[in-house]
From Swiss-Prot:
ANK repeats: 19-48, 49-78, 80-107
Disulfide bridge partners, by residue number: none
Domain of life: Viruses
InterPro entries: Ankyrin_rpt, Ankyrin_rpt-contain_sf
Keywords from the UniProt entry: ANK repeat, Repeat
Species: Acanthamoeba polyphaga mimivirus (APMV)
Identification of the protein by name: Putative ankyrin repeat protein L14
Amino acid sequence: QSIIRKLILVSKGTNISVDNNYVVRPTSIKVYIEVVKYLVSQGANIRADNDCAVRFASRNGHLEVVKYLVSLGANIRADNDCAVRWASRNGHLDVVEYLVSLGAVLS
């Protein structure tokens, strides 16, 4: 589904918490920080599915989204430090440095 369609569904009362809060993941991938903020304001759980949102944002190098999710309590060490490993594999040094500065372990 497109981001616009998801927002329309949310505005019409669709439950955004279904399917492990999957709606937060695609927006994190596409770095729509304002959309992520909106979804969170509507009750999306950024910690769903073992903090998948912060892992996807890290994998794609979206530092602003990563910082926002961390500010809301995302666990950067979830899934054995997957976020920092994905950021490293994809060459996102700024994300790697940020996550390591917060205690993520790159091994």
